């Protein structure tokens, strides 16, 4: 363990990640100082009584006298107080950097604009079914630092967001993948998509194997080194999806391994997620039979293209996790019906480019129901659109227009934070309303 004794350590943010950082040091007898710009952060009640806390703002005096600052993923490095600290050469890191310094077992890491939680969960399920003791977490579920508490793990499988990668410098993995890079979080990255991409690419540093998307050059490494690259694709290469007798198949080395329709999950984007998971399991030398059986029976994660209600030949799909344009496009591309798609869009678009969404909507029978902060902006994508204040009012409007064979899709292409606690709360609200209205 790297020595932190005698250093003034400041932790910014008291969400679940910040609390994991507090506990990491507290268990090692190391004093920290905590600050959060909220007066009542969610996890304050779990903080030991003898740890100094500053609430309602950032304490600049604490920051400029610190030797180490640990920030939660939601805290921007562009915060004026952190810019001052950086100029003073004070070290600023996140929880994943702490985890990377302490972890003594092999690590697999996954990032991407979309699909990373699904892939992380798929690989985790395969590894567990193979008999491995696995710690699964990071941006999904258990904070990475909390995984260190279980000493029996043989492998860590961690999902990483771009926010976490910003403050990660020494992560070493046996395999890492960037699933895709599309416009997202542009409100966080003032220099645009290339700045966002370069942060994602940090996951390849010190990776023994890089798993890249051959269809998305933005996932390709910019620096050559001795690590191995394995590609996956929607149509070409060693690992790909191919059509055979009108069916999609997972193919490896021209061998047709699994008919995609045999899997419980649906959607072409999920077939690619399964393909990436197979690559990781091959790297781990897990028997193919275990991998393929696990993928067949993997039922997906809540709020991700999840059919939550069916009645009168009308399907209601909860895709609340689609918080960006590319994810909504992937959902729409997976739907092929004769009826109408009633698409719920709404929330904070995060300054995203909406033109790609406009193109796909023009080519399908789609009615838009727009709500929340950017409802007016979203409604301009199509002439067949309705503006409502809330998700509830949008769904009441949908009920007036439904016919047999239609699909109602919540795939908002936006952050939920303008009206909901998170995407989960939004998805749960949709599910309850669908079961009531439908």
UniProtKB/Swiss-Prot annotation:
Its EC number is 6.3.2.9. It comes from the Bacteria. One of its GO terms (cellular component) is cytoplasm. It is found in: Cytoplasm. It catalyses: UDP-N-acetyl-alpha-D-muramoyl-L-alanine + D-glutamate + ATP = UDP-N-acetyl-alpha-D-muramoyl-L-alanyl-D-glutamate + ADP + phosphate + H(+). ATP binds at residues 112-118. The keyword Cell division applies. Pathway: Cell wall biogenesis; peptidoglycan biosynthesis. InterPro entries: Mur-like_cat_sf (IPR036565), Mur_ligase_C (IPR004101), Mur_ligase_C_dom_sf (IPR036615), Mur_ligase_cen (IPR013221), MurD (IPR005762). GO terms for biological process: cell division; cell wall organization; peptidoglycan biosynthetic process; regulation of cell shape. Keywords: ATP-binding, Cell cycle, Cell division, Cell shape, Cell wall biogenesis/degradation, Cytoplasm, Ligase, Nucleotide-binding, Peptidoglycan synthesis. Gene3D superfamilies: Mur ligase, C-terminal domain (3.90.190.20), Mur-like, catalytic domain (3.40.1190.10), NAD(P)-binding Rossmann-like Domain (3.40.50.720). GO terms for molecular function: ATP binding; UDP-N-acetylmuramoylalanine-D-glutamate ligase activity. Belongs to the MurCDEF family. NCBIfam families: murD. HAMAP family: MurD (MF_00639). Cell wall formation. Catalyzes the addition of glutamate to the nucleotide precursor UDP-N-acetylmuramoyl-L-alanine (UMA). This is UDP-N-acetylmuramoylalanine--D-glutamate ligase. The lineage of its organism: Bacteria, Pseudomonadati, Pseudomonadota, Gammaproteobacteria, Enterobacterales.
């Amino acid at each position: 363990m790297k020595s932190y004794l005698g250093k003034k350590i400041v932790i910014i943010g008291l969400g679940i990640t910040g609390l994991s950082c507090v506990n990491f040091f507290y268990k090692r007898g190391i004093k920290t100082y905590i600050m959060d710009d909220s007066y009542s952060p969610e996890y304050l009640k779990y903080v030991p009584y003898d740890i100094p806390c500053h609430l309602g703002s950032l304490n600049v005096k604490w920051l400029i006298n610190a030797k180490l600052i640990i920030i939660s993923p939601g805290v921007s490095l562009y915060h004026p107080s952190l810019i001052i600290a950086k100029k003073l050469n004070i070290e600023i890191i996140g929880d994943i950097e702490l985890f990377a310094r302490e972890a003594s077992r092999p690590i697999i890491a996954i990032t991407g604009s979309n699909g990373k939680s699904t892939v992380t969960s798929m690989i985790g399920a395969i590894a567990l079914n193979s008999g491995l003791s696995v710690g699964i977490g990071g941006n999904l579920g258990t904070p990475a630092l909390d995984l260190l508490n279980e000493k029996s793990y043989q492998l860590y499988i961690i999902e990483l967001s771009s926010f976490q990668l910003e403050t990660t410098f020494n992560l070493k993995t046996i395999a890492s993948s960037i699933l895709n890079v599309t416009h997202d979080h542009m409100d966080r990255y003032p220099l645009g998509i290339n700045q966002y991409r370069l942060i994602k690419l940090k996951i390849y540093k010190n990776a023994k194997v890089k798993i890249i998307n051959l269809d998305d050059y933005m996932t390709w490494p910019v620096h050559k080194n001795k690590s191995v690259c394995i590609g996956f694709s929607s149509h070409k290469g060693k690992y790909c999806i191919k059509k055979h007798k009108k069916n999609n198949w997972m193919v490896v080395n021209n061998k047709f391994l699994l008919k995609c329709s045999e899997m419980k999950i649906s959607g072409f984007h999920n077939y690619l997620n399964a393909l990436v998971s197979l690559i990781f399991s091959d790297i781990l030398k897990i028997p193919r039979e275990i991998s393929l059986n696990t993928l067949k029976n993997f039922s997906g994660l809540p709020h991700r293209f999840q059919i939550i209600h069916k009645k009168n030949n009308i399907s209601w799909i909860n895709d609340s996790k689609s918080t960006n344009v590319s994810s909504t496009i992937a959902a729409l591309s997976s739907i092929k019906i004769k009826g109408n798609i009633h698409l719920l869009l709404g929330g904070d678009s995060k300054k995203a480019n909406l033109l790609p969404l406009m193109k796909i909507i023009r080519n399908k029978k789609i009615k838009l129901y727009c709500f929340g902060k950017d409802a007016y902006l979203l409604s301009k994508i199509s002439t067949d659109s309705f503006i409502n204040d809330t998700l509830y009012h949008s769904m009441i409007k949908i009920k007036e227009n439904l016919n047999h064979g239609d699909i109602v899709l919540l795939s908002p292409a936006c952050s939920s934070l303008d009206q909901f606690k998170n995407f989960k709360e939004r998805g749960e609200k949709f599910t309850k309303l669908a079961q009531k209205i439908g």
